[in-house]
């Protein structure tokens, strides 16, 4: 891992000081601990992707779909009442607009996770791009989503309380799995 520590120390418009250090350290830990998971038929490159057969990225996706489906239900009714045609893309856009209302420090990590979980259908200003997520799906497991979410949760836990608050709000089940993964990593 190579970082410009002087730049990391001051942060930027969406990362708090040292947040990038904790993010990259999260990736390093996630990769180094991969060997702790010995699940047959799981080809993920990272601990977070391999853990319990992809439980972490699947839970993230499930939580995102719960949010999208809640908007979908509400918006369908509103559009029907007005006699207008409705498309599910409106639900994704509504979630995106909700997240974009938060400041950059609070939403950047969440934005990346949402982009990964939706394959780019939700883009809140920060992310890796749709191709990144597609290229990092291994054996049906969204390994890219897993490792980025692991790193985002690590950096927010260590250096960005605003971001952590939103992650816990939008991904409570996934964050609990993150904590369980840390326990497994620590206990080897």
PLM regions with names:
Residues 1-188:
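Active-site-flanking segments in enzyme catalytic domains
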């Amino acid at each position: 891992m190579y970082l410009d520590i002087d730049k990391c120390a001051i942060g930027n418009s969406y990362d708090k000081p040292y947040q990038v250090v904790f993010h990259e350290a999260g990736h390093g830990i996630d990769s180094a601990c991969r060997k702790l998971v010995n699940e047959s038929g799981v080809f993920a490159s990272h601990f977070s992707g391999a853990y319990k057969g992809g439980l972490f990225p699947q839970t993230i996706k499930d939580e995102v779909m719960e949010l999208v489906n809640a908007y979908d239900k509400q918006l369908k009714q509103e559009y029907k009442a007005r006699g207008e045609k409705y498309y599910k893309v409106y639900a994704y856009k509504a979630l995106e607009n909700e997240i974009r209302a938060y400041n950059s420090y609070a939403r950047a990590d969440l934005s990346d996770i949402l982009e990964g979980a939706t394959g780019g259908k939700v883009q809140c200003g920060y992310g890796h791009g749709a191709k990144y997520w597609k290229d990092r799906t291994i054996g049906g497991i969204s390994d890219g989503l897993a490792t980025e979410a692991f790193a985002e949760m690590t950096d927010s836990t260590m250096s960005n309380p605003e971001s952590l608050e939103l992650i816990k709000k939008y991904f409570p089940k996934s964050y609990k799995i993150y904590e369980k993964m840390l326990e497994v990593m620590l206990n080897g």
